[in-house]
A protein has these predicted regions:
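Periodic small-residue-enriched repeat registers in elongated scaffold domains
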Residues: 1-72, 76-85
Length: 88
C-alpha cells in the first residue's frame, strides 16, 4: 500500500493516505504504518515544524473536519460568500 505527501514538510504516515500543503499534523492513529490510519486525506496549513496545523482532514467514513469556516454563495474567484456559523 502506498501513501503520498506533497508540499512543504508534509507527512503521510499510514497506508493509502494523501497529505498536501505545509507542515501538517500527522495522523495520530495507533495502527501500523502499513495499515489505514484515521484519515485518508490531510491538508496541512502549518507554518513551521514547531507550528504544525491542519486546515482539513477527511476520514475513511467520508466525514470532513475543518479548522476554519465554510463559505457558501461565493463568486468565481472564491470571494464574497456567506460564512456559515460554527454552531449550526
Amino acid at each position: 500500500m502506498a501513501s503520498h505527501a506533497a508540499g512543504t514538510v508534509t507527512i503521510a504516515n499510514h497506508a493509502s493516505q494523501y497529505t498536501f500543503g505545509e507542515y501538517n499534523v500527522e495522523d495520530s492513529s495507533s495502527a501500523s504504518a502499513l495499515a489505514r490510519g484515521n484519515y485518508i486525506e490531510i491538508v496541512g496549513n502549518g507554518t513551521a515544524s514547531n507550528a504544525k496545523s491542519n486546515a482539513r482532514a477527511l476520514d475513511w467514513n467520508g466525514n470532513e473536519y475543518l479548522n476554519g469556516y465554510i463559505y457558501v454563495g461565493c463568486g468565481n474567484d472564491s470571494t464574497n460568500g456567506t460564512r456559515i456559523p460554527h454552531d449550526i
